[in-house]
Amino acid sequence: MTEEGPGIVSLGKLRRPRMLRLWGICRVQIFSAIFMLMSPAGVGAGAKDDFSLVHPLVTMEQLLWVSGKQIGSVDTFRIPLITTTPRGTLLAFAEARKMSTSDKGAKFIALRRSMDQGSTWSPTAFIVDDGETPDGLNLGAVVSDTTTGVVFLFYSLCAHKAGCQVASTMLVWSKDDGVSWSSPRNLSLDIGTEMFAPGPGSGIQKQREPRKGRLIVCGHGTLERDGVFCLLSDDHGVSWRYGGGVSGIPYGQPKRENDFNPDECQPYELPDGSVVINARNQNNYHCHCRIILRSYDACDTLRPRDVTFDTELVDPVVAAGAVATSSGIVFFSNPAHPEFRVNLTLRWSFSNGTSWRKETVQLWPGPSGYSSLTTLEGNVDGKDEAPQLYVLYEKGRNQYMESISLVKVSVYGTL
């Protein structure tokens, strides 16, 4: 891949923000914690993935960003994304909204990195700056190529057509685990100028056939290209094209309450090689719950007959987190409430998301918004570690956009 101009933004040029007081790790039942501490050593490092070992336990929480002009004079931090690079580095991203809480307006893309499994984080770096654009950038989706080690970050410009006429899908990438980034690449010549809002969340790289190695980034459109659809790359991110999509109903027309209108979405791969896309149900069609789409050809097509509704995943119309581990555990996070963005809850499934375990972990009872998930599995720094789950989410006491917080969860419940 040829980088377009120097465009390298080095971390470390910004001073470390002052330490912030935590709002508290969510409560964990004492007897459950004691039981897990007394469990056999087999559930620690080197343990074989086994559903019977899964007892998610929060082991750490810390704030990464606080709104209110406390970091770099940024008014509001929103839209959290988190990913694990092929080398095991954690990268956390957010929209840094310069002047207001609005989805429109000028922004930075904020980044923090962790190289010690989330214990410590680099100072905030602003890796993209849209200047004073009236309808600036919007995150976004991040995906890594395990073969090349390159991390790709997608975002949109002029998504709302406010003071501008042409939407663009933009891409930056890093070859060194987020230390430096390329200049932005405009994908309009490849995919056109129909508005495509990636994610928000993570893309995936197919780990199984069909199309093993394919990069997939899913998102949603507006009236120009209605519904949920995906970007695909079969050459390690050199070129991108549109794959399958599912349109809203009525197509190309303004939607009303209870119309079918899939929106922000998160893909993950199942053990059989199929791809599930967990989507926001923008107009509460059928239920106050999640729309589930499934593709059996690596998102070349998305068929209406493969669309279902998960009534167990009650949802207040929000961007949620979803991820599948290498052993087939599916995790899901959202504000578990039919109307309000409160009660950020973690759920998990041993049946590919067709059913969910009755036990849950409440991460925050109060105002909570968008969330993003990633896992750290297998060999880390030469050690075979038990799997860890990371939840990056919007958290507040009065409003969910007051901060962005990181929770670390031990999948096997070990400290």
From Swiss-Prot:
EC numbers for this chain: 3.2.1.18
Molecular function terms, GO-annotated: exo-alpha-sialidase activity
Chief site of localization: membrane
InterPro entries assigned: Sialidase, Sialidase_fam, Sialidase_sf
Keyword Lipid metabolism: yes
Active-site residues, Swiss-Prot/TrEMBL: 103, 370, 394
Compartment(s) of residence: Lysosome membrane; Lysosome lumen; Cell membrane; Cytoplasmic vesicle
Gene Ontology annotations of biological process type: ganglioside catabolic process; oligosaccharide catabolic process
UniProt keywords, alphabetically: Carbohydrate metabolism, Cell membrane, Cytoplasmic vesicle, Glycoprotein, Glycosidase, Hydrolase, Lipid degradation, Lipid metabolism, Lysosome, Membrane, Phosphoprotein, Repeat, Signal
Swiss-Prot/TrEMBL BNR repeat ranges: 112-123, 172-183, 231-242, 347-358
Ranges spanned by the short sequence motif Internalization signal, renumbered to the chain: 412-415
Post-translational modification: N-glycosylated.
SUPFAM superfamilies per the UniProt record, alphabetical: Sialidases
Residue interval(s) of motif FRIP motif: 77-80
PANTHER family noted in UniProt: SIALIDASE, SIALIDASE-1
Quaternary context: Interacts with cathepsin A (protective protein), beta-galactosidase and N-acetylgalactosamine-6-sulfate sulfatase in a multienzyme complex.
Protein family according to the UniProt entry: Belongs to the glycosyl hydrolase 33 family.
Protein name as catalogued: Sialidase-1
Organism: Bos taurus (Bovine)
